[in-house]
Amino acid sequence: MKDKLEALLDQALSELAQASTEEGVQELRVKYLGKKGELTSVMKGLGALTPEERPIIGQVVNTVKGKLEEGFELRGGEIREAVKSARLSAERIDVTLPGRRRPLGSKHPITLVTEEIASIFGALGFAVAEGPEIELDFYNFEALNLPKDHPARDMQDTFYFGESVLLRTHTSPVQIRTMLKQPPPVRIIAPGTVYRCDSDATHSPMFHQVEGLMVDKGITFGDLKGILTLFISQLFGSDIGVRLRPSFFPFTEPSAEVDIACVICRGKGCRVCKETGWLEILGAGMVDPEVYRHVGYDSELYTGFAFGMGIERIAMLKYGIADMRLLFENDLRFLKQF
């Protein structure tokens, strides 16, 4: 029986050496050490041996079993290590290869235009001022020469929270807050979000404006025209035509609408400019003395001008965008063009 056990060990180790998968090793383990395995069958015959043979053969059986279990563990480990090495080799990273760049986004056209406007006026000495979007009636209307029941309030469809609290309809309240906080000279622009009850292809209930204010001794309408002409030439090009037309705003006197030569036809007349050759881009004027009264400035000593423009309109003209709603739809196919 000893010879039979040694032959069984040699055969098992030989087959084990040929196994190439963990499943194959497991099958051999069952074949030799399972409940119906070959070594188990031999062990069942120990009872037929003489008392003298039984301990000797039992020791041989234990030795064979121990070597088989050790062999199965070793071969299984070798196979697992080989599989791991093969997988690591297949997944090897060549550190000399160029990396993959993460896709980068781009700035929204509204942001681009706002930053460009701020940069142009910043070079002219204007600081950026900010204020709350939820405003009081005083800052949004009354201090801007728009008392209650003034007919000019109908020019702006306003979102009200109550009698005196509202969503600001322009960024002019920032000018009032700034003048109340500091004495002249003042030179600021106020970019920000504003709200009005209006929505179509060229209007949105939420949009963006940049308004500007300059107050000091000796400021004239000529200063207003010079600064706005310089601003327009830097934004749209030095060859663009500029004109000022008389207009009305409750908080400036005199007031003007500022037009530029149509960016599509260059002043020749087309569908975009309604054959006039001109496009309105902003409103401006000399600050009304009544506004100075509300903020405590001496209108006999100081003069100044204010202006305001819609950023969406500037963006539409600058980038040739036909429908304002494209600026708010978050369509990446559109936004990636900027």
UniProtKB/Swiss-Prot annotation:
One of its GO terms (biological process) is phenylalanyl-tRNA aminoacylation. One of its GO terms (molecular function) is magnesium ion binding. InterPro entries: aa-tRNA-synth_II, aa-tRNA-synth_II/BPL/LPL, Phe-tRNA-synth_IIc_asu, Phe-tRNA_ligase_II_N, Phe_tRNA_ligase_alpha1_bac, Phenylalanyl-tRNA_Synthase, tRNA-bd_arm. Its EC number is 6.1.1.20. Its main location: cytoplasm. Binds 2 magnesium ions per tetramer. PANTHER family: PHENYLALANINE--TRNA LIGASE, MITOCHONDRIAL, PHENYLALANYL-TRNA SYNTHETASE. Belongs to the class-II aminoacyl-tRNA synthetase family. Phe-tRNA synthetase alpha subunit type 1 subfamily. This is Phenylalanine--tRNA ligase alpha subunit. It comes from Geobacter sp. (strain M21). The lineage of its organism: Bacteria, Pseudomonadati, Thermodesulfobacteriota, Desulfuromonadia, Geobacterales. The gene is pheS.
